[in-house]
From Swiss-Prot:
Binding site for Zn(2+): 67, 70, 93, 96
GO biological process: tRNA 5'-leader removal
EC number: 3.1.26.5
Cofactor entry: Zn(2+)
Organism of origin: Methanococcoides burtonii (strain DSM 6242 / NBRC 107633 / OCM 468 / ACE-M)
Family matches, as InterPro entries: RNP4, Rpr2/Snm1/Rpp21
UniProt GO cellular component terms: cytoplasm; ribonuclease P complex
Record gene name: rnp4
Protein name, as recorded: Ribonuclease P protein component 4
Length: 108
């Protein structure tokens, strides 16, 4: 029983470190995008691989900044197109053409 508790604690520590690294890589991608878009794509690719390895869910704001098709960093107007259709926001990657549809609700 004692060993399983230690393993769970160690697993949580590893996931926390991985989450911090993912957030750091996205910050670096945002800073680097204007001067070197290829490097920012690489940072997002690394963050995505870390997330898959340690089975971490990405927060919604970070999900909207990466393309699931080509692992590139998405900047509205530069590397992605954002359109509003009815009750959905459509984000289109301009590299691979993949679309993300995100529902939104208008306040009444």
């Amino acid at each position: 029983m004692y060993m399983s508790r230690m393993k769970k604690k160690q697993k949580n520590i590893i996931k926390d470190v991985a989450s911090e690294r993912i957030e750091r890589l996205f910050k670096l991608a945002a800073e680097e995008y204007s001067s070197n878009p290829g490097r920012s794509d690489r940072y997002v690719h690394l963050a995505r691989r870390i997330g898959m390895k340690y089975r971490i869910r990405f927060p919604s704001p970070l999900k909207r900044k990466m393309c699931r098709g080509c692992s590139s960093y998405l900047v509205p107007g530069s590397s992605s197109r954002v359109r509003l259709h009815g009750r959905y926001m459509t984000i289109t990657c301009l590299k691979c053409g993949r679309e993300m549809r995100i529902p939104y609700h208008l306040k009444e």
